[in-house]
Design a protein with these regions (language model features):
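Alpha-helical transmembrane segments of multi-pass membrane proteins
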Residues: 34, 77, 91-118, 137, ...
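Helix-loop-helix hairpin linking two adjacent transmembrane segments in secondary transporters
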Residues: 136, 140-178
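Transmembrane-helix boundary and interhelical linker motifs in polytopic inner-membrane proteins
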Residues: 17-21, 35-68, 87, 118-127
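Alpha-helical transmembrane segments of multi-pass membrane transporters/permeases
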Residues: 1, 58-62, 68, 99-105, ...
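Hydrophobic residues within alpha-helical transmembrane segments
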Residues: 28-31, 66-70, 104, 130-138, ...
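Signature of the first transmembrane helix
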Residues: 1-44, 71-80, 105, 140, ...
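Short membrane-interface helical motifs at transmembrane helix boundaries
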Residues: 15, 74-93, 149-155
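Interhelical loop/hinge segments that connect adjacent transmembrane helices in multipass membrane
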Residues: 154-166, 180-209
Length: 209
């Protein structure tokens, strides 16, 4: 679904975003994909593997969620602190807000990894698919509204100085909606971190990453 929507939206992006800015958009999205792989650390696969063990499901759910939440939070805080130097390094010195949004997107997406895995493990494919589709549709609605209906003055007040920022912002809104929709599952997480289990998961997950 997300790939289909991206394919449909590409003509809109090409029409409203100049070539140089579109290259920035593409490069940053490639970077987001790479960072998401690193931050997930293969723990989605490890979650399925160790949850299948007898009496291990809750411990695996809690331990894997807290590890990914902590890792993603450390990444987010680091990027927010060193936002401008990072923006300078990647050539976004005039638009450091892109790097901030990128960090928030990565944080929210990785916070959702284990809850999404929980839905699949519990045999709830309809709920899993519904959340994914709602995210994609909401993201599409936001970006189309920004390009076609919302006045430029209003979007600029939200920090979107250029039209290339519209896809980034809409992606952030989609990721935020995902976290909200998954919040009932996130609230099931208990304050539990099993060290021995974590190291077993880490040993299993690292080659997968």
């Amino acid at each position: 679904m997300p790939r289909i929507i991206l394919f449909v939206l590409n003509p809109l992006y090409i029409h409203y975003i100049n070539t140089n800015d579109f290259a920035k958009f593409s490069n940053l999205y490639a970077l987001i994909s790479f960072v998401n792989i690193v931050l997930s650390f293969g723990f989605e696969t490890a979650y399925f593997r160790f949850s299948a063990e007898k009496d291990n499901e809750k411990k695996t759910f809690n331990t894997s969620f807290w590890f990914m939440a902590l890792l993603s939070a450390l990444f987010l805080v680091s990027v927010l602190i060193f936002n401008q130097p990072i923006a300078n390094y990647f050539g976004y010195e005039k638009n450091p807000e892109y790097i901030k949004w990128f960090a928030w997107i990565a944080f929210l997406d990785n916070l959702a990894v284990i809850p999404f895995a929980w839905l699949r493990f519990k045999g709830m494919p309809i709920k899993y698919t519904a959340v994914r589709i709602l995210q994609s549709l909401f993201q599409t609605l936001v970006v189309v509204a920004l390009f076609l209906w919302i006045p430029t003055e209003f979007s600029q007040k939200l920090g979107m100085k250029e039209k290339v920022s519209f896809p980034f912002f809409s992606n952030l809104m989609g990721s935020l909606l995902g976290a909200v929709l998954l919040s009932p599952i996130i609230f099931k997480v208990q304050l539990q971190f099993v060290k021995d289990l974590f190291f077993r998961m880490l040993k299993y997950a690292f080659p997968v990453m």
